[in-house]
Amino acid sequence: MVIGLLKTLVGSRNDRLLKQYRKVVAKVGTFEANLQTLDDAALAAKTDEFKSRLASGESLDSIAPEAFAVVREASVRVMKMRHFDAQLMGGLALHQGKIAEMGTGEGKTLTATLPVYLNALTGKGVHVVTVNDYLAQRDAEWMSTLYNFLGMKVGVNLSQMDHTTKKEAYAADITYGTNNEFGFDYLRDNMVQDLEQRVQRGLAYAIVDEVDSILIDEARTPLIISGQADDHTDLYIKINALPSHLELQIGEEKSDGTGVEKPGDYWVDEKSQQVYLTERGHDKAEEVLVQLGALDDGASLYAPQNITLMHHVYAALRAHTLYHRDQQYVVQNGEVIIVDEFTGRLMQGRRWSDGLHQAVEAKEGVAIQNENQTLATITFQNYFRMYGKLAGMTGTADTEAYEFKEIYNLETVVIPPNRISQRKDKQDQIYKSSRERYDAVIKDIEDCYQRGQPVLVGTTSIENSELIAGLLDKRKLPHQVLNAKQHAREAEIIAQAGRPKMITIATNMAGRGTDIVLGGNVGKQSSLIQVDEALSDLEKAAKIKSLQDEWQSIHDQVLTAGGLHIIGTERHESRRIDNQLRGRSGRQGDPGSSRFYLSLDDPLLRIFAGDRLRAVMERLKMPDGEPIEAGMVTRSIESAQRKVEGRNFDIRKQLLEYDDVANDQRKETYRLRNEVLESADIGELIANLREDVLRTICSIYVPLESMEEQWDLAGLEHALASEWGLKVDLQKWVEGSDSVDDVEIVDRVLEAAKESYDAKVDLSGRQSFAGFERSVLLYSVDTHWREHLAALDHLRQGIHLRGYAQKDPKQEYRREAFELYGELLNVIKNDVVKNIMTVEIRSASELDQAAESMNEDLAKLSDVQYQHADPDMEVAGSTGDRGAALDIQPAPVRSGPKIGRNDPCSCGSGKKYKNCCGALS
């Protein structure tokens, strides 16, 4: 009550921001009259003027009002579109590094041109991030006329582009591309063997379109570059037979032994999307695996040599119980193709990790492709936090405002619409069974069809969309299906979904990014007329006028019928996805309506509220086909959605807490790589590594501050000669000296090593040897880093078991990951020094060939795949330790001053930098 009173008196944070923006919008208006008097050349010259003012010390904020006015005037001249005041406010929010929530049809693409132009004036490059290649190319082509008029170059970064084209795209002032491609380019840039192979030029400012889809929905799906590992085809085929021999247990056994309705061999946790073997199931599985020839008689699944077998067993169980054809995946041309759970699109070329994809292939009887080895990986959370300034826009961000602030430090600003929506959102209708629900859906569609009202039916899976399509076929109702199986025409289909009597069935939010215009979109037809060389200008104008008049008549007809009607066949886990579906109707003040039809069989209701609602229906003796329709029930469903959203937020936050540990190590490894690439000569670095390694070797045989009786000079000589290729006659030297201490022995070894090194450099030439050293170091860093990623992955998958020992799994993961990284640095040091000390040089050309061979070995990327991992595999058993807290706060990654050798290490270990991650420097 007190908070509500304060908001009434002083306004909410959102109200206060909008008040500030309106003042700036008024300033933008003051420049308009003067700019209208300028010719095109003078208006375009404003770009150079702004750059000069910035170079003189002015800030972007000070020139923002005039720059926005210039963009608005240029847009009027070039594109015949003038930015509304609401779009100017959205542009200000984006410039300030906030998320602008703007409804469907409010012109987010045009809004982005304002902050994009302003920030591109710095010359550091602006990235505009979209969800797919089609939207990236469409928006870049659409807006490039405006940017080119103002003297800005536009690039498009698409998948499958060659290196030169990509580099040109990033060199442009403004670069459009997909979130995946920007992330993969970052990873690839940190795998190159030469500076010239990099394509990105820094991460200064990014605007993320459909920011909720990219930073929330896809935040649990890391980007992974992987290569194929060993072939286990026979094992997958054998273990695929196991699930059919096991029985499903109904109910989860509680600590007091209750909760099991029907005993079995495994049980499924639908909330966490995991499968677990029971005690009985372990014994049964061992017995069956022995029969299948996958396990030795008398051996245990828990034996160290069978750890990977256990991993295959769980992959097979998940494939059979949680992953279903035409829901999580489809089978096309003998391949298992993942279906995006958020958009319903096919994810060509993507594969689930940890053997799950192979288990599904074995289940479906298609060719099994090899498992993948991770070469590089990063989450969207950690990638996008590296930008100096990040902003986003979407029609549905407010429900996730807390997560945006908590994870990305992004504030959400709700921009008021240019025209108030007239859409009517009707109460949900809940039926006892799916059959009754679909009967009601078809009846509603039929009613709209008779009245000439267009309908958009939203489904959660391909299976459901095809079920509804089949029911409509039986009623002989014409319709179009938009799902992952045929998304090539999705933008065209969705653009025409507003025509009279049009029935469109869409999987989730397929076609997002394209407006549904009531009466249909005549833009494409108009553009075809414009490029028809057989027509004169007068004929073109007449045809376009006729087309627009016809459209206006159809538009009025649809308005009279009630606008676009939205039908939801199921509630999604997130209220935001439901709001996205509803938001397709009522654009720019158009009328419209929406209704969700639910059944007690829906997963959301079954898990959270099904039993209670079923009891109410039975108590009221409701006849078949009679729905429950009440505000209280709708609120109850939204409450269930909040629980799921909260749980999903916990999972994403937990993934980030784990990934932050790996991210610190990734940054340090990439920093070392870049230092090696950017240095003209790494001789000093190699000398430091050599000294560090040899001092450690000497201390084993000749301990520090030790007596001569404790020395093992013969052992040291043998170790140096056999392992490090260094012959030093220490015993004779000590016998011939009056007094020698341990320090002098170490100095003698270091001097001998330097003489051997200098002789190799003299023989090959400094330039050739420097190239060889660089190749050796990069080869060692890259190969061992890949092994380290696999080690971290295995550590993460089993770390939840530490909870049973009353230990915090996250703290244990952090501690052990740090120890693993320390081991990695030592292995790299020893590997590099050993390779350089033991190499036998006969000529410079031989050395060049060796370096070239190593570079080629690292660059063999023909079998590399770019994919999202299955988010559920990322934190094994994550629900069990969600409450445990990690004592580090996720921090934005920023470039800063160089860390001093005696400063605390950035990885959080508490050690000095020189004794931790800086050991290689």
Swiss-Prot record:
Positions bound to Zn(2+): 905, 907, 916-917
Region annotation (Disordered) ranges: 872-901
Example of a GO cellular component annotation carried by this entry: cell envelope Sec protein transport complex
Chief localization: membrane
InterPro entries, per database record: Helicase_ATP-bd (IPR014001), Helicase_C-like (IPR001650), P-loop_NTPase (IPR027417), SEC_C_motif (IPR004027), SecA (IPR000185), SecA_CS (IPR020937), SecA_DEAD (IPR011115), SecA_motor_DEAD (IPR014018)
Coiled coil: none
Binding site residues for ATP: 87, 105-109, 515
Family matches, as PROSITE patterns: SECA, SECA_MOTOR_DEAD
Catalytic activity: ATP + H2O + cellular proteinSide 1 = ADP + phosphate + cellular proteinSide 2
Top-tier EC class: translocase
Gene Ontology biological process terms in this record: intracellular protein transmembrane transport; protein import; protein targeting; protein transport by the Sec complex
Cofactor binding note from Swiss-Prot or TrEMBL: May bind 1 zinc ion per subunit.
Subcellular location: Cell inner membrane; Cytoplasm
Family: Belongs to the SecA family.
Subunit annotation: Monomer and homodimer. Part of the essential Sec protein translocation apparatus which comprises SecA, SecYEG and auxiliary proteins SecDF-YajC and YidC.
HAMAP family (UniProt xref): SecA (MF_01382)
Full protein name: Protein translocase subunit SecA
Originating species: Polynucleobacter asymbioticus (strain DSM 18221 / CIP 109841 / QLW-P1DMWA-1)
Gene that this sequence comes from: secA
